[in-house]
Amino acid sequence: MFDIHREELDWGGRTLTLETGKMARQADGSVLATYGDTKVLATVVSAREPKPGQDFFPLTVNYQEKTYAAGRIPGGYFKREGRPSEKETLVSRLIDRPIRPLFPEGYKCDTQVVITVLAHDLENDPDVVAMVAASAALTLSGVPFMGPVGAARVGFIDNEYVLNPTVDEVKESALELVVAGTGDAVLMVESEAKELPEEIMLGAVMFGHRHFQPVIEAIIKLAEKAAKEPRNFQPADVSEVESKVREIAEADLRAAYKIKQKQDRYAAVGAAKSKVKKYYEELALDGTKVPTAQVVSDVLKALEAKIVRWNILDDGIRIDGRDVYTVRPIVSEVGILPRAHGSALFTRGETQALVVATLGTGEDEQFIDSLEGTYKEHFLLHYNFPPFSVGETGRMGSPGRREIGHGKLAWRAIHPMLPAKHEFPYTLRVVSEILESNGSSSMATVCGTSLALMDAGVPLRRPVAGIAMGLILEGEKFAVLSDILGDEDHLGDMDFKVAGTEQGVTSLQMDIKIAGITEEIMKVALTQAKDGRVHILGEMAKALTTARAELGEHAPRIEVMKIAVDKIREVIGSGGKVIREIVEKTGAKINIEDDGTIKIASASGDAIKAAINWIKSIASEPEVGQIYEGTVVKVVDFGAFVNFFGSKDGLVHVSQMANERVAKPSDVVKEGDKVKVKLMGFDERGKTRLSMKVVDQTTGEDLEAKAKAERDAARAAAPAATGDEAGAAE
């Protein structure tokens, strides 16, 4: 019934198995990949013909994690998987990026790649396994795919590269890098690092590329046994269209791409394209067969790319007039929003990000439900890209894949520089609003986030900056471009973004569109990126060099205290009654952890102090000799009872109310009065003895201690005085 084919190899100390022919047989291609006990099923279906008028390649990649893969049931009311999680969205992009460039130009058949995690052993992250499975399924499917693609995760532990580190090993690693590519080229890199030098980062890329070659060989062997007949796809011959388009528009396009201002340049480019469109419309009116609008558009794009690329390679001059090294003018401002805890406006050329930082408490942490279990995230970074930022109208609403991906890239850049949670126990939410965009808005977000957090008083280890780089390669000639524009991103051969501090890289993202980019070229690019990053850090320093010494005026203050674990129940109370009362009466937010750590937060210092004292009164015992502020709760003939330590009461005997004789306690105090008392001790029955007369009721000073200090000072002075008098008598 089943025609099963399988390939196995030892990879990173674990067995990788690729199997086809048993599951999802009606898909064009399907592969079950097993690594350890992690199992991932990848399927590919591609339409036989493109839709009429289709003007782009409709590739969709959907990565989905099923909770049954880890033996869990989904949370929520409906108890089933819902909208994609952030991780599912990010992994979908991770798979899409290396496979998309490997489809031939002009292929426009609707193609869907679906990857499903069927089992997760909680040791081997399914994302790399999913990339391998998707590559294998595409290779077997018969669709025109110039793969296969391999992928690997690389760690850096104890100064050694580690292939496919486990989930636990990643936590100890100074680097988490995912690399994908073909047999002779790297296509995609995604990473987070702890200020590593460029040579370590590049070494990790090449290490991963070497070590996924056996995976590519296994996919090829599987394809030799089980691949479907390749589909016949021939790109249309557009040589005549190319010739005519050059004749009509090349001169105008060359002139347009010498205009430095983006909107004016776009207008001139649009006018040149309109001339071509008008020519073919008039031709069609005469009954002449003309190419489709999409063919003409594709030819125009290719001509634009050629003009821009050779202008740079021949003259070293870019679209906006810069040379290949120059970063656009930068303006950094901080503290621009009066009620925000921290804010920054970062402008680089025609790219601008308004970044706002907000500090919260443990209650504000995000609960994340993953296959590995539920955990809390205390650093959130949200990136928004409204259509007005590029002068367009468009959809507004929940974030798309691109916004989630750019936000995560900036998150990775900043995350290694955050203070440890026990040092700075705040939840941090950063929102980046892209107000203008002409390339590198994610890196503007990195720079703005660094400034906004420092403006909020978050003690980053060092400021972080990011820069987007590009590459143009034609034969032996190449040019690396610093701080690329949006047009240079689309027309170049490599787009890579590097973020970090003056000491090293914290995040690297790379997308390479062609083969032939050598290790040496990447080394040049990374070195040039470092120079650009250091320059940007210098420009940012004009606004702020380090975190402010104090938190923002409107930010909450957090104090941390510790109580015995066996006292947690008393502080919380039956059904949370006690803790709710403390919160309601003091106005402070309180978070209690299982180890007895308590975080008290409020914008008011008095509220924090009141909450701390209340909790102390429950979880600890009063100390003899200490002075406390209390409230008179009852006046009797022989004294007054004072509530002085949370729920604890003590007696101030009438003889301890004042130094002079008191006839009636009610002459001195009444119920509700605030008084200062000293704990004198406990009587034989364990009752608390308090005194008011030994405490200055205005200042709270211990009068007994003051008198003792004066007596001690007098005794110390007496011998000296006696000696002086004896000397004078002689």
UniProtKB/Swiss-Prot annotation:
Record field: compositional bias (Low complexity): 715-730
Region listing for Disordered, in residue ranges: 700-730
Keywords from the UniProt entry: Cytoplasm, Magnesium, Metal-binding, Nucleotidyltransferase, RNA-binding, Transferase
Family the entry assigns: Belongs to the polyribonucleotide nucleotidyltransferase family.
The name this protein goes by in its record: Polyribonucleotide nucleotidyltransferase
Keyword Nucleotidyltransferase: yes
Name of encoding gene: pnp
Provenance organism: Xanthobacter autotrophicus (strain ATCC BAA-1158 / Py2)
The S1 motif domain, residue ranges: 625-693
